[in-house]
């Protein structure tokens, strides 16, 4: 259930990125989406402006190319020696990812006024939109996401990671540690604030 919720949040975040790239709205799409969900589904929780902003950060941090790279790293990291893990972290930190379809969309001219006049209650087809833009079946997208280490920690832990300026490899290390050590989001926050990764690497 947690992994499916994360996948849904990831899709929502990608939808927001798509709208921002297409129309150049900045934060307006987030406010409108939060209002529309609150209007149509008042019983649904977790769709505040703040949380939708985190979903946007979440999707931006883990596009499909990054998810695939994390899966590849997981596959190669079956031997969990300190040296192997350190090499994996450095490789992720140094990897340069190409732009994906969502990031390549050019802003449209003079479309903001038209869109802003649409009914507030309109709820978008998030899944269909993301599948079309990324040119990949939603089932394949879901398989990639759920196979990645990103799907193995809870949302509160992801928020902790997003709130810290960590390189991809270091984020990966903290995700792996959270799963293996059974850390709560509060423990994870404490470990990041105490620079656990740096301290462990320096102690080798």
Q: What name fits each language-model region?
A:
Residues 1-204:
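Basic, low-complexity intrinsically disordered segments
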